């Protein structure tokens, strides 16, 4: 199972940076939440998640599409820490689903306080609401079982056994 965790830029799509993130006057902060998710996955016998630092690299749509086409990712986790990340989440999810409709897209961070909107207006499949480490591992376990089963459709009821997630059921109802 191929898993990628990405950072999400806070600027609106198309915003032109005046300089590279690494050229700013302040130090670059580590991505603590992403490191924690990866650490929890490793502790639970999942391989190291790939990390695509979209916030730092600030790639265009074609580069993002190429990355996900080349890496054939089964699960993508977004770390969306502020509300201004919404349009970027919408953009990134659209690009990823264009490459592979079956990729499971999980969004975490403060933005998921608006889980209902995210799930209805973007191509995100699951929102993690609150601390994400345990939920992230639960999602990975479920996805591993799903991929091994050979079934096309995720088992929503089984997935909802994972505490701390929100998703839309088959009737488009928001479930926690």
Residue ranges: model-predicted function:
Residues 21-41:
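Short catalytic helix/loop segments, enriched in acidic residues and glycine
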Residues 2-28:
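Short glycine-rich His-centered loop
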Residues 33, 40, 48-176:
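Glycine-rich beta-alpha loop elements in corrinoid/cobalamin-binding modules
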